[in-house]
Regions:
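A glycine-rich phosphate-binding loop feature that marks nucleotide/adenosyl-phosphate handling sites
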Residues: 179-186, 319-323, 377-382, 401-408, ...
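Structured, non-catalytic alpha/beta "coupling" segments that mediate domain-domain communication
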Residues: 75, 89, 99-102, 226-239, ...
């Protein structure tokens, strides 16, 4: 079975069997995807995280299918109907739909029309009709008129019911209809009569019809949502006449009275059994594909958001802006600890701008603030303008930060534990400030689904979505690495090999024993075994550690290699890291071993070049157009600066500084053809856009980037 799996995975994924075998072996030993991708390149042949995850997903699917096979085999054996030929077919089948087709005739059924007919003794009549030789079947049917069968027509109808079930359970028939659905199924949606007003948001789908194979994931999910809400009536299917003709060619072999009865049974089988069954199958299959696409888009957006550029360890003022209730202001030190909070009222109805600025200036000086983070919600533009109208005594950078999900964090258990003595407004402002300092460290505290970068996220498979988003967060956290002495429990939880319990144990150990001075000290943490240490150590950094390698992505298992490099050059590790000239003299091929290849050595040399480098780029200041505050200020043809706020498979949404985001359709993103928005844009990217159309009634803005960002 194992070799079969390896062969099938290789064919499906285009990865050599040996690499799949070794990757699965590492996964079965408890190695994580980030660890395997980073530190076991020689073993896997350099597979990346996406490939390793694909191996795991497909392997799990095959295992599920194998379990289903066992259940089916057991069920057929219990009925005493297993044959050598049937067993061989089951053994050779690795397609879910085919497997279920094989099992269908043996599957326990509720009391079907065919079953009732069999109980009435009509199966021999059905067999007679299927042979299609009898010139006068009605005459032969008279023998079956007894008991619950009242007349010849009832006998014929019962026989047709048995034939219809046989047609439905016939593999060739099912594949015939399945192929028709695959090639030509049309998805049709219509508004439910009398619900036009209630269904206004689904106006685009009030009377739409398109081939299923060309229906994009976002359209399909929107249509299915409308159906779930009882606002749209949805159907799916190929040409019925063509399908029944195909089935008749399979089963009707004579143009006599028996053949006519079989033709009737075939039409009934298609309409009552086959079509609904295959329609359900294709509805589920198309929904699964749409889910996978929506989840892929969400995960990619989340990755870009988590890997947004950090300001770094600077003293920051966070402002959660507002009108009536004022602006909540907090001051944080370079480690993100809360130093001070108060309210200011620069806007109506209170309108105390002079007093507000005086307070801001005093806080800037008292707490030596280096940057200001303003939430991008209500009163954001007004607060930014209020601050920029004044001249500060010191050089201060002002940033507008997304506050999506901040309110969810502020009311969460995590926030209450961090700030038990403060209300939600303070916690929200702190979150805004910390997002500027380190988006990744702050956003891991929030359920990814609350961050607002998904499409139809509530309509997709929730367990699959959670798994994908959790893996995305884990991937990002391990890509960046974390400071072992400052990372929160929530951040540490996502580190390879840790999880909630070990993460909490690390924080507890830190509180009791002070800062870690070396990675080896991790082995003193309760429940930290050698395997967990192996998995996590390379992703945890200790700035200013006695061993400088403890602040790099070099794994402790490779320290001896770096030490040997330094020894061969007549220096210590610190001198090797500090001297470009010394590093030029390293000949990596000298350090090759049976287990350490060139990929690992190249990674080590990159780390020595830039120890503990952050893969996230430097942060940039951005300004919206000062003349645009609301949708009423917009004009067609206007060119504006914007920030990409969300990406879907049909385009990108851009924040242009007003309440409503504009949409740049896929066709308007570039001067060339692109199939994926991620080819040209990323979350939080600064872009220039031109307004194509404004729909004031529906609050929709169409934008273009063609010719704007060259």
């Amino acid at each position: 079975m194992t070799q079969t799996f390896h062969r099938m995975l290789s064919a499906t994924l285009g990865i050599p069997e040996k690499q799949i075998e070794k990757t699965l072996s590492l996964l079965s030993e408890g190695a994580t995807i980030p660890f395997i991708s980073r530190y076991r390149k020689e073993v896997t042949g350099g597979l990346n995280e996406v490939q390793i995850e694909a191996i795991q997903i497909q392997y799990d699917k095959l295992n599920e299918l194998a379990k289903r096979k066992e259940t089916i085999v057991h069920a057929i054996e219990e009925q005493g109907k297993m044959t050598a030929e049937l067993q061989k077919r089951l053994d050779e089948t690795w397609d879910s739909a085919t497997l279920e087709d094989i099992y269908l005739p043996y599957k326990p059924k509720r009391k079907t029309r065919a079953e009732i007919a069999r109980q009435r003794g009509l199966e021999p009549l059905a067999t007679l009709l299927m042979l299609q030789r009898e010139p006068n079947p009605e005459k032969r049917a008279e023998a079956y008129v007894k008991g619950e069968v009242k007349n010849v027509e009832e006998a014929m109808k019962g026989a047709r019911d048995i034939i219809a079930e046989q047609v439905n359970e016939n593999e060739r028939a099912r594949n015939c209809i399945r192929n028709a659905f695959s090639r030509q199924a049309i998805l049709t949606a219509k508004v439910v009569k009398g619900k036009e007003e209630e269904a206004a948001k689904f106006r685009d789908y009030f009377d739409c019809s398109e081939p299923l194979k060309r229906c994009s994931s976002h359209r399909l999910l929107a249509i299915r949502r409308g159906e779930a809400e009882g606002l749209l009536k949805v159907s799916l299917g190929p040409d019925d006449d063509e399908c029944t003709e195909r089935l008749e060619r399979l089963f009707v072999r004579s143009n006599n009275a028996c053949g006519q009865q079989v033709a009737q049974a075939v039409q009934d089988a298609y309409k009552r059994l086959l079509k609904p069954s295959i329609e359900t199958e294709f509805a589920a299959l198309s929904k699964e594909r749409a889910d996978d696409e929506a989840i892929r888009v969400f995960a990619e957006n989340l990755r870009q958001l988590l890997l947004a550029s950090p300001l770094g360890q600077k003293r920051v003022m966070g402002i959660d802006p507002g009108f009536r209730t004022g602006c909540k202001v907090v001051c944080l030190d370079a480690q993100g600890n809360l130093l001070h909070n108060e309210n200011i009222y620069p806007h109506p109805p209170v309108s105390k701008p002079k007093e507000a600025f005086a307070k801001v200036q005093k806080m800037l000086e008292t707490y030596k603030i280096e940057a200001i983070a303003i939430g991008n919600g209500t009163a954001s533009r007004e607060t930014e303008e209020f601050l920029k109208q004044h001249t500060f005594r010191q050089d201060i950078q002002i940033f507008v930060v997304s506050e999506q999900g901040a309110s969810i964090y502020s009311a969460s258990k995590i926030a209450r534990e961090e700030f038990p003595d403060y209300d939600v407004t303070v916690r929200g402002a702190v979150s805004i400030a910390r997002r500027l300092m380190d988006p990744l460290a702050e956003l891991v505290k929030i359920d990814p689904k609350s961050i607002g970068v998904g499409q139809y996220q509530h309509d997709v498979d929730q367990s699959k979505l959670k798994k994908s988003l959790d893996q995305t967060v884990e991937s990002c956290v391990n890509l960046v690495g974390v400071n072992l002495n400052t990372a929160s429990t929530h951040l540490l939880t996502y580190i390879s090999g840790l999880g909630p319990q070990l993460a909490q144990n690390i924080v507890n150990y830190r509180a009791e024993n002070g800062a870690f001075t070396s990675r080896k000290e991790l082995l003193k943490v309760p429940r930290m075994g050698n395997k967990a240490f192996e998995q996590c150590a390379g992703f945890l950094r200790i700035p200013h550690a006695k061993n400088p390698l403890d602040n790099t992505a070099v794994h402790p298992e490779s320290y001896c290699i770096v030490e040997q490099m330094a020894k061969d050059l007549g220096c210590n590790v610190s001198e090797l890291i500090a001297s470009k000239e010394l590093r030029k003299n390293i000949k990596p091929e000298r350090y090759l071993t049976p287990t350490v290849g060139m990929p690992t050595l190249q990674d080590i040399l990159q780390e020595l070049e830039k120890p503990g480098r952050d893969p996230r780029g430097p942060i940039k200041v951005f300004e919206f157009d000062k003349n645009v505050r609301t949708i009423d200020d917009l004009q067609v043809g206007m060119e504006l600066p914007g920030i990409v706020s969300n990406i879907t498979n049909f385009g990108a949404f851009v924040d242009i500084g007003i309440k409503e985001n504009g949409l740049v359709h896929l066709s308007q993103l570039a001067d060339r053809y692109i199939s994926d928005p991620n080819e040209v844009v990323s979350i939080h990217q600064h872009v220039r856009v031109k307004i194509l159309n404004i729909d004031l009634e529906r609050k929709r803005i169409q934008l273009t980037m063609k010719g704007m960002n060259g």
